[in-house]
Swiss-Prot record:
This is Homoserine dehydrogenase. NCBIfam families: PRK06349.1. L-homoserine binds at residues 192, 203. NADP(+) binds at residues 17-18, 49-50, 107, 189, 192, 309. It comes from Mycobacterium leprae (strain TN). The gene is hom. GO terms for biological process: methionine biosynthetic process; threonine biosynthetic process. NADPH binds at residues 18, 49, 107, 309. NAD(+) binds at residues 18, 47, 309. Belongs to the homoserine dehydrogenase family. Residues 356-435 form the ACT domain.
């Protein structure tokens, strides 16, 4: 039902970078949006924590009473861009219960509670849209739920965190170490004061959970996603990567796997990996994002663009708002959520990939054969070995660095090998263990 036959009432929760841009678009593009929707949008109110703060909008639109705002009879659609998970969850559930369609960009909430929110929307016969939650302005949710609805998605992978991609791109192009590249990202506003969620892979894991759930029609939460961060990557790793014709990216990978018993499983993981320069993802630099979808009939599709920031994210939010508003005008709903099967998750130990292992060792005869023996004991086949001298600040040779590239091996076998290498007297330390993706096993 319409609150008014001539308008679609909108409430915006949150007036940060994204919320401010959404309000600007609603007001600045009012005529264009009305033409696309079939009725004008009317901004009914904006939920904020502190009404007294000057925010550059009419004060009579501001309220700190979120519950009252989302239950108003003249509000048809609630746009949630607040951030805090529990506060957002309560507001969205309340809005849905009051018959409001909801647009949200809250990836952390969706990664934990997509099922709960989707069921609430279904029960209330309203829409729940969240295109902006995964990759900012990049359209990937709608292609998965609509364009590929008749296909079988086999794999979804890519780069969905602009902060880490900027840091790794800077390390690759300038030779900077991690701390220097992080400082540069902070100076440009790409990294938060506390970058943990980005650099330890939490942000990418939440997005991977959302995409895996949609792509494979199963419930995946952020806790189901195996995760590693980028804080241990060194300039030496980039030197070795370039020698191998690769660069290093923080990837998310979600894929459908058929286990030995014939049962289908889902693997979802986030980690830094070597990517061949010939792969499309290797060219995604700076704060840009990209998602590659592989489907049975459609083949490989790639989506690229700005994955974060106020304006790009607001673009996706407003796109969802237009879709929800059109449905209100027509008295219809968007596509219903698929019926979900609870496919089991594949543990990381059974996932087979190629590996890059770097270690500092004593510079003496027999070391290489001892290292190779540890790989052989666990049936981890070596594809390539590189050895170089290590010198101190005075140019005196003080040891050697060995880089081993393997053929396909399970994570479990490789982990056992690394533990054994660390126990060898001649190994001073295993400095890096990275996977190689986009390379045939």
């Amino acid at each position: 039902m319409f609150s008014d036959e001539r308008t679609v009432g909108v409430a915006v929760l949150g007036l940060g970078n994204v919320g401010s841009e959404v309000v600007r678009i609603i007001e600045g593009s009012a005529d264009d949006l009305a033409a696309r929707i079939g009725a004008p949008l009317m901004l009914r109110g904006i939920g904020v924590r502190r009404v007294a703060v000057d925010r550059g909008v009419p004060v009579d639109l501001l309220t700190d009473n979120i519950e009252e705002l989302v239950s108003r009879a003249d509000v048809d659609i609630v746009v949630e861009v607040m951030g805090p998970v529990e506060l957002s969850r309560k507001a969205i559930l309340s809005a849905l219960e009051h018959g409001k369609s909801v647009v949200t960009a809250n990836k952390a909430l969706l990664a934990a509670s997509t099922g709960e929110l989707a069921q609430a929307a279904e029960s209330a016969h309203v829409d729940l849209y969240f295109e902006a939650a995964v990759a900012g302005a990049i359209p990937v949710i709608r292609p998965l739920t609509q364009s590929l609805a008749g296909d079988t998605v086999l794999r979804v992978a890519g780069i969905v965190n602009g902060t880490t991609n900027y840091i790794l791109s800077a390390m690759d192009s300038t030779g900077a170490d991690y701390d220097s590249a992080l400082a540069g990202a902070r100076a440009l506003g790409y990294a938060e004061a506390d970058p943990t969620a980005d650099v330890e892979g939490h942000d990418a894991a939440a997005k991977a959970a959302i995409l895996a759930s949609i792509a494979f029609h199963t419930r995946v939460t952020a806790d189901d996603v195996y995760r590693e961060g980028i804080t241990k990557i060194t300039p030496a790793d980039f030197v070795s990567a370039r020698a191998l014709g690769c660069t290093i990216k923080l990837l998310f990978i979600c894929e459908r796997i058929t286990a030995a018993d014939g049962q289908q499983r889902v693997s979802a993981r986030v980690y830094p990996a070597l990517v061949p320069m010939s792969h499309p993802l290797a060219t995604v630099s700076g704060a840009f994002n990209a998602v590659v979808v592989e489907a049975e009939a459609a083949g490989r599709l790639m989506f690229y663009g700005q994955g974060a920031g106020g304006a790009p994210t607001a673009s996706a939010v407003t796109g969802d708002l237009v879709m929800a508003a059109r449905n209100r005008v027509l008295g219809s709903r968007g596509p219903k959520e698929s019926k979900y099967a609870q496919l089991p998750m594949e543990t990381i130990g059974f996932i087979s990939t190629r590996y890059y292992v770097s270690m500092n060792v004593a510079d003496k005869p027999g070391v290489l054969s001892g290292v190779a023996a540890e790989f052989a004991k666990r049936e981890v086949s070596i594809a390539e070995v590189r050895q170089e001298g290590v010198v101190d600040d005075g140019g005196r040779r003080v040891g050697a660095r060995i880089v081993v590239v393997t053929h396909g091996a399970t994570d479990a076998a490789l982990s056992e090998t690394v533990d054994a290498l660390a126990d060898l007297d001649v190994v001073q330390g295993v400095t890096s263990v990275l996977r190689l993706e986009g390379i045939s096993l």
